[in-house]
């Protein structure tokens, strides 16, 4: 699809010139200071990356190219008869920085359909894994097996100029995004549906076709996938999956290797695995409180009991956010618009009403509000997806949109290999002693 590629070329050329001028005039300007505590606490708040696609505000939440989630739900093109945005439109926005037209989105859908064939050896490699392998293990294995198809790796081996890197990364990105739903659906049907696979339906958009290949025909589940794959796509550049994809890509590893690395980070319990932990915790809560619909008072006591046992309330808190995650709110609205009543979703709502003041009262939690994971599992369960381990694969399909759009920008802007400095605790101690001595003089 040369129109999109040419439009990106124009945007990248203009931004490169702007950055070159900015560095010449203001390259020595300091952005701020950081503390020893920040180094020991995951570099939280330390500005160290450039990510063009999105920015996370502690109060407002994520903004994709300046647009909030409510704005995107209103402005992005939608499938006929749907009120939810098409992920193809979000990808266009992340890559180009503009709201696409219906025609722009239709062209991306057609292009991804054209690119979506997955080589047989990819499925053969997945089939060599034991059925009890975690879905993320199978998913990432499939992506690694597809690396044989990397246009960037082939071009780099032939010898290309640095200015050409982004063009081949773009091709890999478009191919990868087209194919990851097929690999993800294959893993789901292999592990949970007795290897009864479903061929793609090219009359459907990217998200609806993914729902179809998973085996879900309910139009509202298709709508859920459109929303889910849109709101999970990007969360600025410092989270583990985005940063890892960027970091590995900075070594000029191709997009297949880079995405697989990022998804391995997403599989961690502190990142993308959290959504399955939330729904498991809610079912434990429900069972311990008698199996029916509990009261707010019962939920409050269960939360206090959870905290007293030294455990966390999954789905609450965020490294950056200090208010309710707008992605949580978007899923709340989906529930009200499409479902009306569901016991698990009602429990999610009651937890939302009682948990924040309890968490805040502990004095240990900076953000007592729900994040995106607090609601997503409940919606999936409503439509019959009880396979909690698989939820992170859905997250991974979505996150590919954001991290790969960023990877194209990384190569277009000529970003160098990432190589920060590191020090030892002994070095820190000596630095502190030196500062104390200097102040005493």
What are these regions (language model features)?
Residues 1-441:
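Hydrophobic alpha-helical bundle cores within soluble ligand-binding/oligomerization subdomains
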């Amino acid at each position: 699809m040369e129109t999109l590629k040419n439009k990106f070329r124009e945007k990248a050329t203009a931004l490169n010139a702007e950055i070159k001028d900015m560095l010449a005039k203001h390259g020595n300007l300091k952005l701020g200071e950081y503390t020893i505590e920040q180094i020991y606490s995951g570099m939280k708040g330390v500005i160290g990356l450039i990510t063009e696609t999105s920015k996370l505000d502690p109060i407002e939440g994520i903004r994709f190219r300046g647009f909030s989630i409510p704005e995107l739900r209103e402005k992005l093109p939608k499938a006929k008869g749907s009120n939810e945005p098409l992920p193809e439109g979000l990808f266009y926005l992340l890559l180009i920085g503009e709201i696409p037209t219906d025609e722009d989105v239709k062209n991306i859908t057609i292009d991804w359909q054209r690119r979506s064939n997955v080589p047989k050896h990819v499925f053969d490699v997945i089939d060599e894994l034991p059925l009890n392998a975690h879905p993320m293990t199978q998913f990432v294995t499939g992506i690694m097996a597809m690396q044989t198809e990397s246009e960037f790796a082939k071009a780099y081996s032939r010898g290309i100029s640095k200015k050409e890197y982004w063009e081949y990364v773009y091709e890999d990105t478009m191919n990868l995004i087209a194919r990851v739903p097929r690999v993800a659906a294959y893993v789901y049907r292999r592990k949970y549906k007795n290897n009864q696979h479903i061929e793609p339906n090219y009359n459907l958009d990217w998200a609806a076709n993914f729902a179809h290949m998973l085996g879900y025909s309910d139009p509202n589940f298709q709508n859920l996938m459109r929303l889910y794959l849109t709101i999970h796509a990007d969360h600025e550049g410092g989270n583990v999956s985005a940063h890892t994809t960027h970091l590995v890509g900075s070594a000029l590893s191709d997009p297949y290797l880079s995405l697989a690395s990022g998804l391995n980070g997403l599989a961690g319990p502190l990142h993308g695995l959290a959504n399955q932990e939330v729904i498991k915790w809610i079912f434990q809560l429900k069972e311990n409180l008698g199996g029916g619909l509990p009261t707010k008072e019962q939920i409050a006591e269960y939360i206090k009991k959870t905290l007293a046992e030294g455990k966390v309330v999954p789905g609450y808190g965020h490294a950056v956010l200090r208010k309710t995650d707008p992605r949580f709110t978007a899923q709340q609205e989906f529930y009200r618009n499409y479902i009306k009543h569901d016991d698990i979703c009602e429990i999610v709502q009651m937890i939302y009403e009682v948990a924040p003041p309890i968490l805040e009262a502990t004095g240990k939690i900076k953000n007592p509000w729900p994040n995106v994971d607090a609601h997503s599992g409940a919606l999936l369960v409503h439509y019959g997806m009880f396979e909690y381990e698989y939820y992170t694969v859905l997250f991974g399909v979505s996150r590919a949109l954001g991290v790969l759009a960023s990877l194209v920008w990384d190569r277009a802007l000529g970003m160098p290999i990432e190589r920060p400095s590191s020090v030892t605790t002994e070095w820190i101690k000596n630095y502190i002693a030196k500062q104390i001595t200097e102040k005493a003089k």
